[in-house]
């Protein structure tokens, strides 16, 4: 078994333009994320970080190269690859009339987690959402919604957690709570990947850092 949680080999993505030149968002990118580490993917806005994450999430189809998640090729074993990763997207999107509890239960159901194995209450508690568990999502603050995104990513207890710009627009207190939780997960063996353009944040949290710029 590979000692890499994520392996990227010569990954590329080109977006075809309508009447304009194609845009190459990823250009022959290769790197590996060792299991059990906190790994930072650092780069400015538009560098290609979110494109790479969206390929891992199955939301974007790569143009070339290979990607493995926990040893599973995303093309050959897409279901196993997807079950091995939890992704916290940069955008905060929720059905405004779902409660946090309902959102987590629905997400667990989508992953086929049996009811007796679900960890909904534990996630709500760990992310300081217990008192809002039955409130409509539209009533939550931005910080609470971001914490709920983290909880949704962990409903199936994946060995890898990916956070795409998780502290964008988040106050300092909430940022600290989030990192305390992430460090706790990492101590329990979860591999963590975060994208950020904050060098100081990456240096404080990460075991190692890769820099991506202009898709490379």
Predicted regions mapped to residue ranges:
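Conserved ABC ATPase signature
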Residues: 136-140
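Conserved ABC ATPase "signature" region
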Residues: 105, 109-132
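Walker A (P-loop) phosphate-binding loop of ABC-type ATPase nucleotide-binding domains
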Residues: 44-48
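Conserved catalytic motifs of ABC-family nucleotide-binding domains
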Residues: 157
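Catalytic Walker B motif of ABC-type/P-loop ATPase nucleotide-binding domains
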Residues: 161-164
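A short, flexible loop at the N-terminus of ABC-type nucleotide-binding domains that lies
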Residues: 2-6, 14-28, 35, 78
